[in-house]
């Protein structure tokens, strides 16, 4: 995990990002006993560290390789016709599917709050996959309908940013 962190900080490495996402997905699916996963974590501190590392470093690496611009009306513009986007499109989908699973299964309010705040930074990259966006909005609505006030506010903030992707610009 420390090697991946160093590689992500120094080089913004997509290879280290893919390994980190594979570990993230494996940890979240570890309760499935019939499926063999590439990574297995038994310590709760390592589990928390892996989740927080993935949530914090994924937006940083994506912003480096595929930066987005915010337009005057608040919408996001992502350069999707680049080679880097085609390489990182599947990891973005994997990230959101794992975050959805995390939001549905995580009982700790602090970790849910971190997951909501960090996943909001990745929402501009969600525009290509409407099914994942729909599932993400459902998970956000689930968090908004239950939980404490700061989680409700974070979920509403994520919903607002997600709605900016799919609403038409206002007429002038």
Model-derived features with residue positions:
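Hydrophobic residues within the alpha-helices of tandem HEAT/HEAT-like
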Residues: 58-62, 115-124, 155-165
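Internal amphipathic alpha-helical repeat/solenoid segments
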Residues: 2-114, 133-145
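Active-site-proximal segments of catalytic enzyme domains
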Residues: 150-151
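Conserved small/polar residues in nucleotide/adenosyl-binding loops
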Residues: 166-171
